[in-house]
Amino acid sequence: MTPVLQVGLEVDLTEFTQFLWAHKVPHRVTEEGQSQTLWIAPHINAERIRELFGYWQGGGELSKVDVVVHNPKFANSLSISELKRLPVTALVIGLTALITLLIEFGANSSWMIHFTFTDFVISGDKVSYQTLKTMLATGELWRIWSPMFMHFSMVHVLFNLLWIWMIGGAIERKQGHSHFLLLVLFSGAIANLAQFWISGPLFGGLSGVVFAVLGYTWLWDRIAKQPLFRLPQALFGFMIFWLALGYSGALEFIGLGAIANTAHLAGLVSGLAFALISKIWRV
């Protein structure tokens, strides 16, 4: 994400962020020291957001304005040639979009049953599902990774794909296709296995891999001789804060649905571990 403006902690951004959510503008607010920073997705017109913020701070009514969200420069960056240079990133994005549409954001169980960690049957209020041993014995090994491509809301899939495009793409660009593929497979398997162990097969999302790539880039820059990714320190702090919010139940309370907290934590740990493994064995 891209920082678009920074204000003091005394400024209450609630109304402005509610306005952004209402217009489906992906964003985050982080705090560091005595200031707070508004981050937006790269396809959002940053100048327009600054104009709207100034208008709002001047007493203007946000209900009377429109939001122009697309940044034409970003559209150009998502060219076919760029996707060809990042085949693993493109594959992850493509599979996520395809499978999420096939399951209709979780509404189509006849498709969803093919991508959950194990096969399952719902009878009334009870869910019965295969054990891990049975799943492996049947040879359906794709299920180890397929849950990460399922998403159950538009906001969820957009946020995850933006992180994968920005951070995952940076890893692939700087360290190679095979390196990023190994990170995705390693962290995806661990996150999915951990979440299955805790909650059964009814979960999905790339968030475990997102936490992995964030943790990986953060630690890599701290153990390498020269920083490679140079992500803001506040980003890792926000990631830990978001993880804590998930475990507190606050995210479910405000209507974001069930959160795969174990997958998030396992993904973060696997990303940190992969950074250490890569550094030691030069994967």
Region annotations inferred by a language model:
Residues 2, 9-23, 28-51, 55-57, ...:
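A detector for small-residue-rich transmembrane helices and their helix-helix packing motifs
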